[in-house]
Amino acid sequence: MFNKPTVFIVGAGASAECGLPTGSQLKDRIRGGLGFQFEGGQLRKGDEALLQLLRGRFSQVNPYIKAGHELSATITTFPSIDEALHWWRARLEIVELGKLAIAHYILDAERRSPLAGKQRSVNIEAANDTWLATFISMALSGLEQRAVSRAFENITIINFNYDRTIETYLYSALQPARWNLE
C-alpha cells in the first residue's frame, strides 16, 4: 500500500508487454497503412480497413489519400506520431487522418492483446508477468481484503499512452466480485 500521495508518470510504450505497439511500432504501422497505392483501381499497398474507414467517414477521399502519402513519407523524420501531427497541424486532413490511424491501430492492438478476453472481458492472468501485476501487488500490499477500495487512494497515474491497457487492467482486477466483496 502506498501510505503517502504518490504520482506515477507512465510513458508511451508501457503497454508493450501486453501486446500493444511502442511508439516506433505505431509509427511503422501508420506509415505502411497510409502509403496507399492503387493499380487498375485496386488497392495494392496500404491498409484496406483504414481505406474503408476513410470512405465511410469522408465524402471526398482523394485529399485524404494524398494526405496519407505525405504523412507516410515524412513520419519517420519525427520521434513520435504526436510530433509528426504537430508538424502538419496546419493541414487538417493530415491531422484528421493521423488521428484516425492512431485510433484504428490502437483499437486493433487492444482487440488482439492477450488481455482481451472473450465477450469484452479482460484476461487478467495474461498480465501476470508484466509490470501491471507488480504494480497492483504493491498497491494491495499491507491491506486487508475489506480495505481493497482504499488501495489507490494515495495514487495518481499520469498516463501518456494512447491505449487503455492500464485503465482496463486496474478496473477489471479491482472488481468487487474478484475479491468476494459483494
Region locations from a protein language model:
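Active-site periphery "cap/insert" segments of enzyme catalytic domains
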Residues: 2-6, 38-182
